Amino acid sequence: HKPVLEQEEAVGHAVRAGYMYSGMADVAAITGDSSYIKAIDKIWENIVGKKIYITGGIGARHAGEAFGDNYELPNLTAYNETCAAIGNVYMNYRLFLLHGDSKYFDVLERTLYNGLISGVSLDGGKFFYPNPLSCDGKYHFNADHTITRQPWFGCACCPSNISRFIPSLPGYVLSLIHISE
């Protein structure tokens, strides 16, 4: 694939991409390098304009747990991994810190309230790995061919990632930044 500074489209594994894009925003903020700012801004525009679900979920494809093509946003077969939603929150938070624009918090909140928290049951004991937008009772979207939240997974990144993310919530509730003009 392209070097990060040449990327304009979100591609590949949605979780890893979300973390990489978060890192790009951090590098842009720390160094002030306009090439990183330009690259991450283009990628963000691609995500929010062409690759994000109404829930804030990202990563349309089960194959590769990946972003799909532009506008490839199926409901029934949507992947929208819980960990990808967490990566989306991280990326938008860092972009908010970089730019100070509330549009990033709009995406963060949409993802948090709809695409991320849907990954855990109300009692906190069962989880979704993928988060499809619809269920017909026939398409078994979980890897074990079920259609319900599960107490655990063979690859248990989502439950542990939620456990890591939830304690960080207070830091997202109130964010103050100083922008010098």
Predicted regions and their residues:
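Glycan-recognition and catalytic cores of secretory/periplasmic carbohydrate-active enzymes
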Residues: 1-181
